[in-house]
Amino acid sequence: LKACRDMGCNSKLVTSYDPRGRFNKPNLEIFKENVYDFWDDLEGIGVLLTKSNIKYWLTDPKDFMHELYHKGVKVYADYYMPDCQAERSMPTDKEHYDIFTHFIDNYPKIDPIRSWIENERNVVSCRSSKLVLEDGTMCLCGNLVQEPRDKAMYKTDIQKANNKPIEKAFLEKYNCSTCEYFHRCTLGCFMAHDYKYAEEIFDECVYKMTHRYIENQGLR
């Protein structure tokens, strides 16, 4: 950090928090100590929406994320990108909805919840093939390069450098372009949507249901 700042870069730290996938009790205490050791340099944390983490946050109101959130730390909820281990970690659409509504009711400043509530328009959460950077670089999902056993977990033939097949499959499935929430919907993770063993309990898009919940709560 000092080296970056000496070069004129305003550098901060971001860390990730995966309570059910990464820590036993002693390691969690070490993690907490490290967070507070670097408190003045901490910009935010990313939390991972796995099945076990969602269950944990829904049942444990005293979790460390709760503490950090209420101390003003920026929190971003990131989607679980499935691989060959995903059958025990990939949440259902109902579990996604349950955690989204829990965050709306209790942690409305967690992104992307905050963006859904506050913004009229949002960028997609995935680095989709429709995004082109200033230097002309076409953005692609960083996880498209998969091992053969991982690629077998998807409905669509995953291309090494081409998001379009999985984007098209999701956008057409829910007819996103006609949705009243399309401009402020971040669409989630296209690879997670394409996971072969994803359990879909709802007949409707979980993001559409979540945006409707936000409106019904009077937050828009």
For each predicted feature, which ranges?
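Radical SAM enzyme [4Fe-4S]-AdoMet core and its adjacent flexible, acidic
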Residues: 7-139, 143-152
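Flexible mid-to-C-terminal extensions adjoining Fe-S/redox cofactors in radical SAM and related proteins
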Residues: 143-220
